[in-house]
Amino acid sequence: NSANMSFALCPLLNAGAIAAISHVGSAEQKARYLPKMISGEWTGTMNLTESQAGSDLSAVRTRAVPDGDHYRIFGQKIFITWGEHNMTPNTIHLVLARTPDAPEGVKGISLFIVPKFLVNPDGSLGARNDVHAVSIEHKLGIHASPTCVMAFGDQDGAVGYRVGEENKGLAYMFIMMNEA
């Protein structure tokens, strides 16, 4: 028996994203994203690290600006495993970001769903969201895993949907980390 760690990271991260949305996502988020993530039609990613916020997530600068029933996400994340690929038609990014009045430190981080392609109410794919890979990281031993620098909001802001309560994003991200 053998395994390919580069490839295995994709379903492992997807399982973590499924767990986080299952535990703290709204009924609408669960209905919209989980069926295609569970079936493997879509994949999920974990977006924590920033150039100035590696192991110190209190320094996260990615912003989430309220805009009606969603948020506009602005920022850049690094070391995003399976951040950009063509293996599935959509990637559901789970992103840590700060809302305008968030307290400082890790107690001011919220979690957002930021899909690569927006998802219409009927489940079909809509427009490309304002999220893209800036570059591919070169990591020893897992060359088949597209680990990326991801940019959110270079144009009008990436559309994001808050998962769970505001300012509890780090606790929610640990659900994903423990599963993945």
Model-derived segments and spans:
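Internal helix-loop-helix
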Residues: 1-31, 35, 39-40, 88-92, ...
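Glycine- and acidic
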Residues: 1-5, 14-19, 45-47, 74-79, ...
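Short acidic, glycine/serine/threonine-rich loops at helix termini
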Residues: 19-25, 55-60, 83-92, 106-107, ...
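Gly/Pro-rich turn-and-neighbor structural signature
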Residues: 21-66, 70-72, 78-79
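Structured core elements
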Residues: 45-47, 61-65, 72-74, 79-81, ...
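Short Gly/Pro-enriched turn/cap motifs at secondary-structure boundaries
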Residues: 52-55, 84-86, 101-103, 139-146
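A short core secondary-structure module
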Residues: 70, 74-128
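A glycine-rich, basic-preceded beta-loop-alpha segment at the flavin cofactor/substrate interface
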Residues: 79-81, 118-134, 139, 146-178
